[in-house]
Amino acid sequence: MGFPYNNGFTGTYKRKFNPASYKYAYVEDMNLSKDVWERVPNFFNLYKIHGSISWYKDEGDIFEKDYVDIDSDDTVMIYPTPLKDRTTLMVPYSDLFRNFESSLLKQNSVLVTLGYSFADDHINRLILNALAIPTFKLIVL
């Protein structure tokens, strides 16, 4: 689709997980003489709350692969196990949840879900809180 997005990783060669990037403002023009900068149109934050097969851990930090090796043992994901809820309290998931919740609670926020079964109570609680905000929109695909 060609929309610009932020997935929580920063850098060019070796993209490292940086939860602070969810707080960055992405603007069209870096002209410092302007009083008001215009945000990049159609920009969105992407939260992979359960991790991704394109993430790996190296010396305690989380990085993004530029290719996906499905047979790799170093992927960073939450698998559907009895330890799932405890895993969500660890890095990087705790940062993702905190930033995800903060984004949901902003006025005029929109959540687009793709392939989510709504079977995770900890995520559903965040969505239910957001649904109490009159300007919040939920789109389920």
Residue spans for each PLM region:
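Generic structural signal for short, flexible, solvent-exposed coil/loop and linker residues
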Residues: 35-38, 42, 67-68, 82, ...
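Residue-identity detector for threonine
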Residues: 10-12, 75, 81, 87-88, ...
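SIR2/sirtuin-family catalytic core signature
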Residues: 86-88, 94-141
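Extended, H/D-rich, highly charged conserved domains that either
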Residues: 1-77
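N-terminal start-of-chain detector that recognizes signal peptides
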Residues: 16-22, 82-85, 110-113
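Flexible internal linker/loop segments at domain or repeat junctions
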Residues: 60-98, 103
